[in-house]
């Protein structure tokens, strides 16, 4: 099972399809197919669980797991440029004249599609976890662009998809700054020694610190001068470590050994059982973490 490492979180505005067989049909219409010789990119669904190759969604306890698979042919610009220059030189020598701008553009397209079948492929998986109980959608994606690509595929598959990022009355960076300034973190959270602080001024600076006591006088001075905390390393319930960003994304999520050991009694050879147990454990713990975090942001006083 893939333990999520980077979380992009969204709120579902409308419930998803409850009929699992209907969901499977919709996903099957957009199942992953490898790139053809003249295709640069292909995106589609693959089975989340290798041992269940006929199922494009994994569902348990009203939690759904999907896996978007992307193949992208990689053609370095330098390779295209080198081949294009060679072709231009060859044609100009044959025709004893300089090629026009439009002719060069047309030739560039020809070179691109001639090289494409020989290009190597880069593959990328983006995991989507849908919590139908709390109407949340969590993507294991390191960037907004990657998350949006997977959401676009899901929207295309379902016909519609109404999701929005979580929002709060106060900016996240304001709350993170107050946590440090007041030495008053929400219950369950412990401050670690890594953060990023940015000035609110247009030409202001950025401070990135590691192995730094965030309650030190040095950090206090940065906050007093107007800098806001935009990234903050935290530990939750002695089980999960993470970096919380001002856009509410969670980076470098690490499930500590004390948490993973809860499923250590399961025989690793029982792949399906291990997958099921790990998914249930991960989704339960992350749900509690997110609820704890969202509650802290929502209750923040004026």
Curated annotation (Swiss-Prot):
> GO terms for biological process?
DNA recombination; regulation of DNA recombination
Q: What is its main location?
A: cytoplasm
Cleaved signal peptide residues: none
Q: Does the keyword Cytoplasm apply?
A: yes
Q: Does the keyword Cytoplasm apply?
A: yes
Q: Name one GO molecular function term.
A: double-stranded DNA binding
A GO cellular component annotation here is: bacterial nucleoid
Keyword line: Cytoplasm, DNA recombination
The subcellular location is:
Cytoplasm, Nucleoid
What family does the database annotate? Belongs to the RdgC family.
Chain's role: May be involved in recombination.
Q: Under what name is this protein listed?
A: Recombination-associated protein RdgC
Annotated organism of origin: Hamiltonella defensa subsp. Acyrthosiphon pisum (strain 5AT)
What is the gene name?
rdgC
